[in-house]
Amino acid sequence: MPDAVGAIDQGTTSTRFIVFDRRGTILAQAQREHEQIFPRPGWVEHDPREIWRNTHAVMREGLARAGLAPGDLAAIGITNQRETTVLWDRRTGEPLHDAIVWQDTRTDRSVAALARDGGRDRFRAVTGLPLASYFSASKLAWLLDHVDGARAKAEDGTALFGTIDSWLVWNLTGGPDGGLHVTDVTNASRTQLMSLATLDWDEAMLGVFRIPRAVLPTIVSSSAVLGEARDPFPGVPLGGILGDQQAALFGQTCFSAGEAKNTYGTGCFALMNTGPAPVASSAGLITTVAYRLDGRPPAYALEGSIAITGALVQWLRDNLGLIGASSEIEGLARSVEDNGGVYVVPAFSGLYAPHWRDDARGLIIGLTRYANRGHIARACLEATAYQTREVLEAMERDSGCPIAELRCDGGMTVNDLLMQFQADILDRPTLRPKVSETTALGAAYAAGLATGFWKTLEDLRDNWAVDKRWHPHIQAEERRALFAGWSRAVERSFGWVEENA
């Protein structure tokens, strides 16, 4: 009887395969990085063939390290970097171009042209998304318009489009020899081509971006048996797909409305489950699909993205030389009792949710002769917590649903000082789970549910365990004063970049 589930975690910089047991404990993992390709300023690409080769390799390596055979796996789940766009030839399996990565901004001008007629929110009611080069639709349109023969191949069904999950599933299930061309609802919701109401491709959106329907994958549930793998693990069911941030929400077992998680990495991604109906945002958030279990209604989410959090620590290390390693920031920040009145607003390329101010730029404010390296380090950590509070308050305003606690994951959660201050400034507990790989765990859970390895969502809740919990310690007046100072600092960052400068 199979006693493990495997998860492919295909990220922006690397691909991993992680094997979990029935308790959600990691048995083994393998990882390989792939090349970041920068053909021009603002362009970011990946080689889909390299990603597939690495996926194939880490699957074999990870399973071997676990001491298991393919038959020991009940299912395989997939989680992936979202929005990254692949176009390939279904006859040969060869990409028509390198994948255009979610960070790529080559379509900024075409998106701005669309926004001139109706504004950046003109399609938000249908897709939940503002007009942005971030999402897949404009990237696919660029490929169809700039790759020789691509549009003709797309129109006759010879070319296939997909986000990274689609590319992996197609290759895992046979490639040119009958590979499945599918994507799940979470990834489809990030293309700007899917209707949140119907969970199908929207004909009007296809018309706006001039996308032939024949090029698109079939949209499936996030947890459902899609078929069986053929290579490298013949016969093992493919049971689930989730975009990376939705996978983290699922891995954190945020299955009820009002439950939220925040992933602390280079930036932060906060998601809140809003239940079975989409919640429109008037506070600068994105409305998206959280997940859909096979045969059940979908769960929706509000998402807020913060551009610079962990990257601010890297800036202190690499640009200012205040620390020699990122791990040193906690000790430096603890060398002082508070921020000394110093605030750092990390608007290096503007501010994301909930402000969305392209004209903002970074600042350090509140400096006196009293301020020292420790105060600046502490202010950098506190900036992450302040920005998270702004996003969570926007979520509560949009949804009308209070967030009782925040489940935290990602690399920065090892910083106890940050996690304590996060609880203090939110005035609610923050929790770090015992299993830190929540993104891969979410993909494993989705796949295991589909195959009966886990029976119910309650089985998954029973697996979730707290590694550490932080409760608020500061008084309400101190919290109010600290956040008021942050708000004043943020306002002063606005308008630095002049439109015609």
Curated annotation (Swiss-Prot):
Swiss-Prot/TrEMBL keywords: ATP-binding, Glycerol metabolism, Kinase, Nucleotide-binding, Transferase
Residues that, per the record, bind ADP: T12, R16, T266, G310, G411, N415
Regulation: Inhibited by fructose 1,6-bisphosphate (FBP).
Positions annotated to bind glycerol: R82, E83, Y134, D244, Q245
Coiled-coil intervals, chain numbering: none
Catalytic activity line of the entry: glycerol + ATP = sn-glycerol 3-phosphate + ADP + H(+)
CDD domains: ASKHA_NBD_FGGY_GK
Gene3D superfamilies per the UniProt record, alphabetical: 3.30.420.40
UniProt-annotated binding residues for sn-glycerol 3-phosphate: T12, R82, E83, Y134, D244
Enzyme class label: transferase
Residues engaged in binding ATP: T12, T13, S14, T266, G310, Q314, G411
UniProt record similarity statement: Belongs to the FGGY kinase family.
Protein name (record): Glycerol kinase
